[in-house]
């Protein structure tokens, strides 16, 4: 994948990430229910580290899909209130919910193996 052909928004479609904002966050993510683990990808436009995750996610789509996550995404540079809600110290940040309960968060992209291990731990705590 060349730098010229990389479109960072491709990851949203590739992982079926639903956009959320501060107004609809609770209805979509927290009250969205079910036993599926929800992962909210908080990012910022032109954020270098966010784009590193997006590139990695496009390269490892299948592995990320196999984690059985319901994905959401929000640009916290545009939605500052949502960034404040989570007292972000940096992006990307991944916040996890299940059955209305916030289970944890990952700040920064740790790499695929570490991300998979963290998600597996959360899945096991069902």
Q: Which residues make up each language-model segment?
A:
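N-terminal leader/targeting and pre-domain segments
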Residues: 1-36, 118-126
